[in-house]
Amino acid sequence: EPSELEKAAYTVALDAYKQGGAKKAIAPMQNFIKNNPNSVYISNAYFWLAEFNLAIEPTNYAEAKKNYGIVANQYPNSSRAPRAVYQLYNIAKEVDKNSTQANQYKAKLLKQYPKSEEASFFKK
């Protein structure tokens, strides 16, 4: 069960995003991760950090990939993991133009999360 403090710190980071956008939310989310490495929210925190990395101008693809990768590889049972893998697929395909890597992410998504909403995007 997360402590009130931990819950508050996580909420602060998300509120920073709601109020000030991704740019304002990156530092509080990084602080949350640094101070609460074993939090029940940790996989979500890395996921949101990756989303913020994508949402800023200029987009920080390197950090986004790193943080989505942490969710996908270290927290494969997280509810955010399928989305993280899908985002990695999109970045590989659209940004890095690396079809080999994109196909690896697609295969991983279909194999590990066949019932996910993200997997269904490939079945249309």
Model-flagged regions — what are they?
Residues 1-124:
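Acidic, polar-rich low-complexity tracts and alpha-helical solenoid repeat scaffolds
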